[in-house]
């Protein structure tokens, strides 16, 4: 069953705070459906007898082309239409090849572009309505790693790979090829028993670094020296020149983290900003491209060895179960466009198949009415903000192919929801997530934005990474690496997570899903505190009230009791003067959790304690008309109280007028929201002084430590969490 996009599993499926401006955006009038067809085993047997190429097979079959045929499996959008167009071309080639005789395999022919011009190739389908539909999956012959070179003579393969000889100091060789099985087992045993040893240090920009390694005998954690530029990295020649042109200079922070990224260690980076996001995007794109090319290079060299020594007993293990090696999880289609722009400027292919279709369905212009919106809002929601998408990407020697089928892809880019729609079949059909079995690099960018969609989808995807496949998918098991066969791939996979801030959910991902034997690091900022950056002309009193909570499970109940017995009682008294005469209104109650919002809304509507209290409510599921009505009634004073959720602010960034005092049922996850919401007090200049006197009151417990650190600052947090010394703290 496909879960909804809200943070609560029972919430409406299609609602996501009202967002969804993207072109087409996968929201067609047709109900999403999946199709699957299984090719009979006899077909596979016949194909093998006819010389069909599997993973690791010789690359001399004339009928193998770069583009997958109609029997290839799990696809991204539009691949079915593309295959229908390519089939006549395949048939023509087969007819032309029949006259070459059977005296042995013919030398592969390849069109040579002597002018070396870049060409964008468009493969049009017959039904454009499928362009943004669902992945149409079929089971058939799978693509081998290195298949893109099958139509290229081996002397050309050697020419392309010249100058990229194996280097024992290359992190790729150390992590994937020259693996000591005994040491690997020791590290996995330590990780399984949570035996990590850690070392803390400082990074440039007031960041704190915690480096962790599996606790094995005689191992000492070493802080890696900074890398001053990409020239010092072990890059493929095809990438080195363009990397130098586009990533010419690294700042001190990026230089400190590059050795860990390119050293295949896991990274949780909790200081993503608008200023550094492009740099780290370019770096991780360079890293995954380097990984894809080196993986292909190793497969091709080993294929060449097997061709030269067909009767030898060489054991060359250089592959996984399936071809996809990189998974990049992103929040929106426009974020996917930015990643593709980084990839294409670093890997400058002569041809880009379906590029125009990609930009037509993934990119859009910014909304001109958003000029007053904050910069972080425009970065996240600018352009095509649809959050249901997936894209397969295939690389050949001269071509980048968009919308390649998943089992023929090198990189998969997707949103958590878009990927889950593929993994979870409707109508009782068989689930399919084998294409995630051989992921060696997983990247989560803008993880904080994914939290506001439905983090459960992200957790679901990670729970299905590197599982043993249910079907062979044309795999040559004699070429599969041992740690894949031993179900140890998750301990070799590198995971890179980039977020503007770190939450308990992201920390849980770091603890439970990032189990790399190469080690892992966490980079977190030292916060000055959002309370110091309030956009008001006069000082405002900011009060924090701590309540006791024995466990995270009991925290919602303890918070509700404290609110109704202490905060709400005081609030109701302040609304009524002598003789029951109503006094000033204008109280905004900010609520981070939708579930808490529903509970408080129902309590205010039914409790005798609040029978004389008028209130309005705005959540991420409130219609535009009801939002306008609630805001109008609150501004006019007809409603004394307005309930307002954090996800509403995330998706809309409303400017609420008429606010004279603010109660934070809980502090926001995003520290930017603190200043924006407190700034509501100054939207009416005439009443700014009165509003500043009303001030802000926020509730917190010790389980809110991560959020509170961002709001009050790292140095102030310790005293505020102590059990002794009072439970109320005020700042002006």
UniProtKB/Swiss-Prot annotation:
Basic residues compositional bias, start-end: 18-30
GO terms of biological process kind: maturation of SSU-rRNA from tricistronic rRNA transcript (SSU-rRNA, 5.8S rRNA, LSU-rRNA)
N-terminal signal peptide: none
Gene3D superfamilies cross-referenced by the UniProt entry: P-loop containing nucleotide triphosphate hydrolases
Cellular component, GO, one term: nucleolus
An example molecular function term from Gene Ontology annotations: rRNA binding
Keyword Oxidoreductase among UniProt keywords: no
Stretches the record annotates as Disordered: 1-172
Family per record: Belongs to the UTP25 family.
Job description of the protein: DEAD-box RNA helicase-like protein required for pre-18S rRNA processing, specifically at sites A0, A1, and A2.
Official protein name in the record: U3 small nucleolar RNA-associated protein 25
Species per Swiss-Prot/TrEMBL record: Paracoccidioides lutzii (strain ATCC MYA-826 / Pb01)
Gene: UTP25
């Amino acid at each position: 069953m496909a879960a909804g996009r809200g943070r609560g599993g029972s919430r409406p499926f299609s609602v996501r705070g009202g967002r969804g401006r993207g072109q087409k955006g996968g929201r067609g009038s047709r109900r999403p459906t999946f199709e699957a067809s299984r090719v009979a085993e006899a077909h596979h047997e016949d194909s093998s007898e006819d010389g069909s190429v599997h993973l690791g097979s010789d690359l001399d079959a004339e009928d193998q082309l770069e583009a997958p045929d109609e029997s290839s499996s799990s696809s991204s959008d539009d691949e079915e239409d593309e295959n229908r167009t390519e089939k006549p071309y395949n048939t023509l080639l087969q007819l032309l090849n029949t006259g070459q005789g059977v005296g042995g395999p013919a030398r592969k022919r390849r069109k040579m572009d002597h002018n070396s011009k870049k060409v964008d190739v468009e493969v049009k389908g017959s039904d454009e309505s499928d362009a943004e539909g669902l992945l149409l999956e079929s089971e058939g012959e799978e693509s081998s790693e290195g298949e893109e070179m099958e139509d290229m003579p081996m002397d050309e393969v050697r020419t392309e790979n010249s100058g990229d000889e194996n280097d024992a100091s290359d992190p790729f060789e150390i992590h994937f090829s020259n693996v000591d099985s005994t040491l690997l087992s020791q590290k996995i045993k330590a990780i399984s028993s949570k035996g990590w040893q850690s070392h803390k240090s400082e990074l440039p920009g007031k960041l704190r670094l915690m480096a962790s390694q599996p606790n094995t005998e005689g191992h000492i954690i070493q802080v890696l020296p900074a890398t001053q530029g990409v020239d010092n990295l072990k890059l493929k020649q095809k990438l080195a020149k363009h990397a130098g042109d586009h990533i010419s200079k690294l700042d001190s922070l990026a230089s400190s983290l590059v050795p860990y990224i390119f050293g295949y260690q896991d990274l949780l980076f909790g200081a993503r900003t608008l200023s550094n996001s492009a740099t780290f995007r370019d770096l991780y794109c360079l890293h995954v491209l380097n990984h894809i090319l080196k993986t292909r290079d190793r497969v091709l060299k080993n294929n060449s060895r097997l061709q030269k020594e067909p009767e030898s007993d060489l054991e060359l293990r250089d592959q996984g179960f399936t071809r996809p090696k990189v998974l990049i999880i992103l929040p929106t289609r426009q974020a996917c466009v930015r990643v593709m722009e980084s990839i294409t400027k670093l890997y400058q292919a002569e041809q880009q198949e379906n590029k125009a279709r990609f930009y037509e369905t993934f990119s859009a212009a910014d909304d001109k009415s958003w000029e007053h919106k904050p910069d972080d809002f425009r970065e996240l929601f600018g352009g095509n903000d649809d959050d249901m998408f997936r894209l397969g990407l295939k690389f050949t020697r001269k071509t980048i192919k968009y919308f390649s089928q998943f089992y023929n892809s090198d990189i998969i880019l997707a949103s958590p929801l878009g990927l889950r729609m593929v993994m979870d079949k409707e109508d009782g059909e068989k689930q399919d997530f084998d294409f995630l079995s051989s992921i060696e690099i997983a990247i989560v960018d803008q993880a904080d934005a994914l939290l506001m969609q439905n983090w459960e989808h992200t957790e679901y995807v990670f729970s299905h990474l590197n599982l043993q496949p249910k079907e062979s998918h044309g795999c040559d098991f004699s070429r599969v690496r041992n740690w894949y066969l031993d179900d140890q791939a998750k301990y070799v996979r590198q995971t890179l997570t980039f977020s503007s801030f770190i939450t308990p959910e992201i920390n849980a991902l770091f603890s439970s899903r990032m189990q790399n034997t190469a080690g892992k690091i966490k980079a977190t900022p030292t916060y000055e505190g959002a309370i110091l950056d309030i956009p008001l002309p006069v000082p405002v009193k900011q009060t924090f009230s701590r309540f006791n909570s024995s466990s995270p499970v009991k925290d919602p109940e303890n918070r509700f009791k404290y609110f109704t017995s202490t905060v709400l009682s005081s609030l109701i008294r302040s609304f009524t003067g002598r003789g029951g005469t109503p006094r000033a209104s204008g109280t905004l109650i900010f609520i981070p959790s939708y579930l808490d919002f529903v509970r408080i809304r129902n309590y205010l509507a039914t409790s005798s304690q609040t029978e004389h209290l008028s209130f309005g409510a705005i959540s991420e599921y409130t219609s535009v008309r009801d939002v306008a009505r609630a805001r109008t009634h609150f501004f006019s004073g007809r409603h004394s109280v307005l309930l307002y959720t954090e996800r509403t602010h995330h998706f809309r960034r409303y400017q609420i007028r008429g606010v004279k005092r603010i109660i934070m049922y809980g502090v926001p996850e995003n520290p930017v929201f603190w200043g924006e919401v407190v700034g509501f007090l100054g939207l009416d200049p005439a009443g700014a002084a009165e509003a500043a006197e009303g001030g802000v009151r926020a509730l917190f417990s010790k389980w809110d430590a991560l959020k509170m650190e961002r709001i009050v600052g790292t140095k102030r947090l310790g005293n505020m969490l102590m059990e002794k010394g009072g439970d109320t703290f005020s700042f002006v």
